[in-house]
Amino acid sequence: MTKLHSVDFFPAQEVSVAIEPRLPQGAFPEHHHDFHEIVIVEHGTGIHVLNGQPYTISGGMVCFIRDSDRHMYEHTDNLNLTNVLYRSPDKFRFLAGLHQLLPQECNGHYPSHWRIDQHTLQQVRQLITRLEQVSAGQDLSTVANREILFMQLLVALRKNSLLEGDENTDARLNHLIAWLEDHFAEAVSWEAIADRFALSLRTLHRQLKQHTGLTPQRYLNRLRLVKARHLLRHSDDSVTHIAFSCGFADSNHFSTLFRREFGWSPREIRQGRDASLQ
């Protein structure tokens, strides 16, 4: 597995924050690094595999990667990211208690993927632009300015993420997407889902397509297929059992959609035929 080193991304040893845009981000094999990373998903879609667990990502998602994590990107479609790299929180000169603004692991669960609305995404872009404009200088005012902007970024992300809740349309759609991640295997009525999240059916279709580039059913199918592929690689369950457990009522239809999505049949994935691409 590749290890990325801070010396290749930070302009100086003393600089605590660096910006690394990926416009676009193609498929990238599993790797880890000796720094932390906040991934801002600008637009497009892809699959982010963090510590072996797949997540479908799209515009407005924020991913928090620790220096102890391993991750990779695959099956990307016009995926544009901005990576905010930062050193260990104890390396900051003026900021104390920084960890309180970051996701915290609790009972073995690490809430690594957040969602923000489009207004917050624009705020975040502006803060990142200002961070990019700060020089690599180490005089007190420059260091303080850099760290203040980074703290403002963390505050904006936390305040406007799903953790804090909101009632606008963007927030309701983000809650819907998070709900689908947890309930992908259930039979879905889009009319009932729209009612559940106080959206009109037309708004649901339009907004989900705008956020993910996919129709609602296509997005749900991709979620199911990604989860199924994970089980094919990491469990001994039969293909038929996996198809049913991921929400497909017909294993033949599942196999057809699977090959169309990934270019391999479920049995080929089970046999590790795609291993060279992982």
UniProtKB/Swiss-Prot annotation:
GO terms for molecular function: DNA-binding transcription factor activity; sequence-specific DNA binding. One of its GO terms (cellular component) is cytoplasm. The keyword Repeat applies. It is found in: Cytoplasm. InterPro entries: AraC-bd (IPR003313), AraC_XylS_family_regulators (IPR050204), Homeodomain-like_sf (IPR009057), HTH-like (IPR037923), HTH_AraC (IPR018060), RhaR_RhaS-like_N (IPR047220), RmlC-like_jellyroll (IPR014710), Tscrpt_reg_AraC-type_HTH (IPR020449). Its main location: cytoplasm. The keyword Transcription regulation applies. Pfam families: AraC_binding (PF02311), HTH_18 (PF12833). SUPFAM superfamilies: Homeodomain-like, Regulatory protein AraC. GO terms for biological process: positive regulation of DNA-templated transcription; rhamnose metabolic process. Residues 191-212, 239-262 bind DNA. Residues 174-272 form the HTH araC/xylS-type domain. Keywords: Activator, Cytoplasm, DNA-binding, Repeat, Rhamnose metabolism, Transcription, Transcription regulation. The record marks D250 as: Interaction with sigma-70. Binds DNA as a dimer. Activates expression of the rhaBAD and rhaT operons. This is HTH-type transcriptional activator RhaS.
